[in-house]
């Protein structure tokens, strides 16, 4: 076959199919064009155990599952499951640590083979815990420990995260629990001799220090552990004692909020006495051989959540968290630090989606990867490597994900993935409801409220994904990088259903303005014909600011409630919509000013307009997203009345660097002086900061669950000696 024919086949297949063939495959297949098999989901990777990776993908018609993979220094291996299916999974074993693997997917249909382009995964990000050989038993006698461990895991349902064995003795219960679960187990006891013997036994078996650690404490009444961290607390010595060691006060202090479980064995009388100071927090039940006291810790008081890009569906950048009254960094303490690090992400500049947090969990996006963590101790719950996940320049778009109590919803190419927030498993797939758009459009904004998810359609290539080069700093005041991503339809789907409840189509919807409150969905759209004719998904013509309407729909039915023609200053730099206290606030940034507008959420009538100069025209000072606390909307450096637009204050503490603002009831969190992560106490107007800690260039530090969460987002910065690790902070008086 001549080279011209080979190139023709390559070019044709690249256009028609979801695949690009290698030279070897072209030589093998000759003139035969394969029958296309569409990938509904491109292959993605999840790690379940060290040294292994499972690849998943979905096709439109059944076929075998075939993977070819290898590292840069190894020959490719081929794995095939011949059973035809549409939901594919292949488990790869024997993988090296800290290694990038390339892989491709081959499908066969009617005797023809189609091979995808190369994808990659990096085992550096296999954060799974090392399993313990179940045949091991370094202890001389079992004494019912195995049965106790099995009962504890079965009755509590806690099998991962951190376990504290309170009064751990020689560590036998700690060993049995670790062997049967993915728990990282810490044992503590005031008996130094028992701790020493346990360390020797576990060290001799090669088990000490990885999954199991034993510590000595002078008193079990005051152990050397931070509060609110342990997913599971049990007791070794209580299994075989007439009196339960220590105090229930200390156990409850250390127990993780929002679902942490204490499960302590003893006699009926000993447990009744032990829980007496906290009787309302425990239940006591009879088992086969003993009684068990159980406590499930509630959420911290007045703890909020961060379920959407700017906190919630109102886009008010406020989690509703009180942080126990804390308004300064010196009123917070480090709760945990660790993974992921800077290598997990892209860089601080491209302005990626914010981390999200809800129901005791934290979620963070990196370079085509996403992970779930326990927000109170940093334990890694799961990690996915997902081609097509990446979205950047969020100030000019909507984020690609949101949360509810149990699921993470991610807009990935033309689909919405519903992922179990505890396990990372893909539970449900939503496709664009208009089948005719699935070849030309992608899923745009991603929001959820109650029983519905909300999405939009954006022309393919509309969302920003470029993260390399000067233009990818996205700090521009005009031109490339400031063009707004817009959707040509908006829709709602009931969770776990497939068909849309309703679809709205009229003008071009500015993604960054879509807001939901009180069962209504609000947005700004342009109905200008020139703007609507743009077929890139990013509207780069000035006509986007003409023929604009503020629109309100019934979120349940899609019924038009009202629409109002508006004429604001052009939002060349950024353009946002926020709901607060029956008002809709439009933020528009145009050199050299911010413009803030107040509209009635009842009918869209304009109530007020205020403006002020930018603090500067670079490093994010010209593109801040507003934050609302109480009756005040803050937009650097001002605070305005939500109701009237009256300037209430102009003393917002100095902000430096490219990051926007997150709010609690008592403080604003942003990048303060010397470019550190800072808190501005709203009442005292005082700024405090953490040394050597910086955020990303948009939003990577959020308050949630009674904490401040800072998954690493500042990697790549050269303007300081920064700590490039993830951290969680808890109020220092939360004990």
Model-predicted regions and their roles:
Residues 25-131:
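Short, surface-exposed linear motifs at loops/turns and structural transition points
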Residues 347-370, 392-417, 438-490, 506-550, ...:
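Repeat-blade elements of multi-bladed beta-propeller folds
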Residues 220-232:
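A short acidic, Gly/Pro-enriched loop at the edge of an enzyme's catalytic core
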Residues 243-260:
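A short glycine-rich, Lys/Arg-flanked "PGG" loop and its adjoining helix->strand segment in the class I
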Residues 375-377, 420-424, 494-497, 554-557, ...:
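Short loop/turn segments that connect beta-strands within beta-propeller blades
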Residues 206-220:
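Conserved SAM-binding strand-loop segment of SAM-dependent methyltransferases
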Residues 123-148, 298-310, 440:
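Low-complexity, Pro/Ser/Thr- and charge-rich linker/hinge segments at domain boundaries
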Residues 158-175, 182-186:
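Conserved class I S-adenosyl-L-methionine
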